[in-house]
């Protein structure tokens, strides 16, 4: 995902104030979310996959809170993806907005043709 598209998604989230079947929001203000594995599994088993955006606090009116440490968060996301069978290979993107970092993990859908 390009930086421009990521920033557009952040703006869209502020307008819609909701998740969708292919978009999950996680706050990640102090650490990597504990229930990430379930979301990774769910998105990887959908035809279209999905996007997880970290740094949005949906419990606090979808406030753009940013993530605790973008580098460490990416490492922990990849570690959880490597534990899955089959292994999930996310495309990770980091953007900065209003001096806060946000991370997007694009999770590819399953390829049933294999």
Locate predicted features:
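Conserved N-terminal catalytic/coupling substructures associated with nucleotide/phosphate chemistry
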Residues: 1-114
């Amino acid at each position: 995902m390009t930086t421009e598209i990521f920033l557009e998604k952040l703006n869209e989230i502020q307008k819609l104030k909701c998740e969708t079947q292919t978009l999950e929001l996680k706050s990640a203000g102090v650490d990597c979310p504990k229930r990430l594995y379930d979301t990774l599994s769910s998105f990887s088993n959908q035809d279209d996959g999905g996007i997880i955006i970290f740094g949005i606090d949906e419990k606090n009116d979808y406030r753009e809170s940013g993530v605790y440490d973008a580098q460490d968060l990416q490492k922990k996301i990849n570690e959880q993806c490597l534990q899955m069978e089959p292994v999930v290979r996310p495309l990770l993107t980091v953007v900065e907005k209003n001096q806060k970092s946000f991370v997007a993990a694009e999770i590819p859908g399953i390829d049933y043709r294999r």
